[in-house]
Amino acid sequence: MCKADDIDRAVQAANEAFADWREVPVVERARVMFKFKSLLEANYEEIARSVSREHGKTLDEARASVQRGIEVVEFACGIPSLIMGESIENIARNVDCETIRHPLGVCVGITPFNFPAMVPLWMYPVALTCGNTFVLKPSEKVPLTSLLIAELLIQAGIPSGVFNVVHGGKEAVDALLTHPLVKAVSFVGSTPVARYIYETGTAHGKRVQSAGGAKNHIIIMPDADMEQTVQALKASAFGCAGERCMAGSLALPVGDAADMLVPQLAQSASRMKVGRTDTGDNVDMGPVITADHRKRIEGLIQSGCAEGAELVLDGRKVSVPEAPDGFYLGPTIFDKATPKMTIVREEIFGPVLSVVRVNTLEEAIAIGRDCPYGNGAVIFTSSGRTAREFKHHFNAGMIGVNVGVPAPMAWFPFTGWNNSFFGDLHIQGRESIQFYTQQKMTMTRWFAPSKSKFQDPIWKPKS
């Protein structure tokens, strides 16, 4: 684990490399990303297997996450056409104005355990192509995949010192947040830590984008295609063992939709196979990340029972004989939960779905507006009018219609609201380019050589 002096060496190396890297033409920096993308694709299966081994995802889930990361590298390859400024010729007589974007310097990424490849790739390909240098601190729970990918970046031609990986806990984080040479910090993780990252980083003069936790609402209207809804909701709630910030953790069936949804979903989820993801067996869910995390989830399940929710499917009863000491939980479903219950208010970050029955769309939207988070929300409906009302009124940054998860896409910003995000410019999309650069306006005037008298640049209307 890195100490403060190790962090300082990494930041110093990045700062020293910045002077040369920023002067490399942006098209040449993009060519490094093209090579990097090719290497990621060539080593796709090895990276996915590393993710699966480290985190416990199924191999298919790991593959999907790696592909999402590669798409950000693909986006970064196009930065030369996206980083262009604006100009006005003759804004005054013989005066031209233009804007250009400059890199910031040393940027930092602090990333979570749940997506060891994808989330870091949300950050540094864009930062590097914009001309910055980078220090990545991945979660100490999943240290290896980041190093595997870093080796590919070196093979792609990234110069020494431009990209650095450090490992550590809070001491390492604090050293990065307070280091005077660090200009910007990107973070993805829980809301308490996201708030700490934002407050500490900005207090020390950093530009910060800090993505926190979520409680994603899924509204099911009576006119929804129930078969499609059940399959999408099952994948949303229990995919990646629920360890993702876009997991669908709260279902809000409207009217009699609940009587159709709950039994079908419980029956389908009960057939999901939970087990080891490293044996080649076809399983639907792997373990959660640690024994402590499983204990926390079990405590929240117990709170749901104690507060009066109806436990329809109990994932604590799952058995994995080939790994009796593994950190396994099966799909868990609560019905007839109420908005003030702990399982409804708190992010669980595990395979637990709570169902709150409502009478109208307006009631579902009101519950969403009362939620302290605002990452994502989804509606299942066959009505365009209903979908439009939902999109317009629901209080969240990522909205889906008839999709299980409004997944973050490389070309669009990951727009969390409320306590799901702290900062001004979001991760991914064009906003990420704005985050990793600063804008300069230049005003240029050239005098006409044949004129000897003063040439006033101020535009004056004719009298």
Locate the predicted segments by residue.
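Conserved C-terminal structural/oligomerization subdomain of aldehyde/semialdehyde dehydrogenase
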Residues: M1-C2, I158, V182, I219, ...
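Short, structured beta/alpha segment
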Residues: M1-R49, R53, V358
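Residues at or immediately preceding the N-termini of alpha-helices
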Residues: A4-I7, V26, Y44, L59, ...
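Rossmann-like NAD(P) dinucleotide-binding subdomain of oxidoreductase/dehydrogenase enzymes
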Residues: G85-Q228, N282, V358, G423
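ALDH superfamily catalytic-core signature
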Residues: P192-T338, L361, V401, A448-S452, ...
